C-alpha cells in the first residue's frame, strides 16, 4: 500500500501516481468490438429454428467478412420460413360437415334458378352474402347494354350455348330438395284432429246424459241396490211430490172457477188462508221428505239386522240351558 499525500498538498500532488502499464494506449488493451450485425448473426441460431444444415452455414457466414458487406440477404430466408409452417397447420384442420353443406347449398342457389318457391327464396336470402353474389348479375347486363350494337348480336350466341346445359343441372338439384319435404300431409292430420274433437264432444254429451240418468235413478230409489228395489217393488218408489203437484193444480183450477167467483160478489174479501188449507192438501217439504226417507232406510236396516240378532241370541241361550 502506498501512503496518500498530505491533505494540505495541492490537488495535483494528492493524486496517486499511475502505474507504468497505464501509460500505454487504452485502445490496444481493449478487445475488438463487434458490430450489431455480427452479434445478430452469432445469436441467430438461438432464436431461429431452421434445418440442421442451415444453422452451421449461417454461423460460418456470420463469422466471415461477407456477412458484414451484405447483411440484408441473411435475415430474409429464416424470417420467411415460419410462415409456410403456419399455413400448413391451418390447412390441416378439418372442416365441419355442416359448413360444407351450407356452402354447397349456397352454391346451388347462386348458380341456378332455385328460387321457385317461397322456401327457396327464404333460404336464398339466408345463405346469400350482403350483395356479393348479386353484384355480378347487373354488371353483365350493364356491360351488354353499354356495348356497341355490333357486338350485341355476337355476345348472346356463345352466352346462350353454355347457359343451356347449366340451367337443367340446378333445376334438377332444386327439384330434389323440394321433393323431400312432404307438404300435402300437413292438412290431413288437422282434419283427423277435427274429427276427433267432434267425437270427443259427442262422447262427453253421452257421458253427461248417462251421469244425469244415474243420478236420477240414485235419488229416485234412495240409493238402494237394484235387488232391494225389485224386492220392495218399484211402484212404491214413485215420487209423491209429483202426485201432490198434480192435485194442487187441479184444485187451483177448480177453485178459480167456483170458490173465488162465489165469494167475489159477497162481503168477504175472498177465501181465507184457513179455507185454502182445508181445500188444498198440505204438500210435504223437501226436508220432511228426506227425513222420512232416512227413517224408512233406518227401519229397513234394522229389519235386516233383527234376524241375525235373534239367531245369535238363540245360539247364546242354548248352552245356558
UniProtKB/Swiss-Prot annotation:
Subunit structure comment from the entry? Interacts with AKT1; the interaction is transient and follows AKT1 activation. Interacts with PPP2CA and alpha-tubulin.
Q: Which gene encodes it?
A: FAM110C
Query: What does this gene product do?
Result: May play a role in microtubule organization. May play a role in cell spreading and cell migration of epithelial cells; the function may involve the AKT1 signaling pathway.
Q: Where is the signal peptide?
A: none
Q: What is this protein called?
A: Protein FAM110C
**Taxonomic lineage from the root:** Eukaryota, Metazoa, Chordata, Craniata, Vertebrata
Report the residues modified as Phosphoserine: 241
Report any Pfam family annotated for this entry.
FAM110_C
Positions of the UniProt region annotated as Disordered: 1-84, 111-203
Keyword Cytoplasm (UniProt): yes
Give the originating organism: Homo sapiens (Human)
Question: From start to end residue, where is composition biased (Low complexity)?
Answer: 169-181
